[in-house]
């Protein structure tokens, strides 16, 4: 996502940085978040997107948005979704597990990955996701996302 934002020259926001302290503490303790826990975080993500739109400025933000209901909460109505692209990074759990094992300094332990995949509802055609092969290196993922975005804007 950072490589995509850099390639586009757009501001980047790491969605995990918007988690309330209670969520960070819970995940750091190895406890999966509930839908209720995620609510304030999803609202912060939505507010960031809304602020960019209101300012007429683009941006890239990361968010696991594991369920359709979460994505609907973030993206809002059809009118609110105009100009917003949902890029879905698709990879098997084993690939993500290997990446998490190498990640340092993040509050979410790799042990929570299984609960995230159990919760995951991959976006369907009605959500018009731009699906990127996340088994690739980051630069290749960014290039694929750029190509998909260009095709949409085409």
Enumerate the predicted regions with their spans:
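Structural signal for short hydrophobic segments within the conserved structured cores
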Residues: 11-13, 85, 128-132
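Conserved phosphate-donor/acceptor-positioning beta-strand/loop module used by diverse small-molecule
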Residues: 80-99, 132
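Conserved nucleotide-binding/hydrolysis micro-motifs of P-loop NTPases
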Residues: 18-19, 65-67, 91-95, 137
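Conserved substrate/cofactor phosphate-moiety recognition/catalytic segment
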Residues: 2-46
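Short, amphipathic alpha-helical "lid/cap" segments that border enzyme active or binding sites
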Residues: 42-46, 138-149
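Small-molecule kinase domains that catalyze NTP-dependent phosphoryl transfer to phosphate-bearing small molecules
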Residues: 102-144
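Glycine-rich phosphate-binding loop used to anchor ATP phosphates in small-molecule kinases
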Residues: 36-82
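Active-site catalytic pocket residues across diverse enzymes, especially alpha/beta-hydrolases
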Residues: 8, 77-78, 104
